[in-house]
């Protein structure tokens, strides 16, 4: 896996939460989240003096200690689910998740702008993040995970 550098069964993503079989529930490696047993690439890079930015779909854990801000990203604009509408905060036709959850820098966003389009918003956030901090001479790591491919 890109963010941890280890096999998915070591980082907790042996299966996505939605597809976890009954015999996998509670089994290490099948937590359905990027577990705390592994360090993330942004955590390591941040420790080496990098700026770290994350934009796009996360789908690796919604608990406060698992969101991008807690896993080494100093700035983020995140869709917490694995996909949904590209133009609004409407989720997939699923009664359990009728509305998407977006976060910015670890804080929930209550309403998206009326002209929201995911790819443009994600690209703009990365560009703004780099531009705002480019003068300090520090390197950066930017992780961009578009949802529009869904």
Model region roles, listed by residue range:
Residues 1-150:
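Formylglycine-dependent sulfatase
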């Amino acid at each position: 896996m890109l963010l941890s550098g280890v096999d998915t069964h070591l980082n907790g993503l042996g299966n996505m939460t939605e597809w976890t079989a009954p015999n996998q529930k509670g089994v290490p490696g099948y937590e359905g989240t990027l577990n705390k047993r592994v360090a993330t690439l942004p955590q390591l890079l941040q420790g080496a003096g990098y700026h770290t930015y994350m934009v796009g779909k996360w789908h690796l854990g919604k608990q406060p200690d698992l969101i991008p801000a807690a896993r080494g990203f100093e700035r983020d604009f995140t869709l917490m689910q694995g996909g949904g509408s590209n133009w609004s905060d409407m989720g997939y036709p699923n009664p359990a998740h009728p509305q998407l959850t977006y976060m910015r820098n670890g804080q929930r966003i209550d309403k998206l702008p009326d002209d929201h389009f995911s790819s443009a918003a994600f690209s703009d956030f990365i560009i703004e993040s780099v531009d705002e901090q480019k003068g300090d001479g520090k390197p950066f790591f930017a992780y961009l995970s578009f949802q529009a491919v869904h």
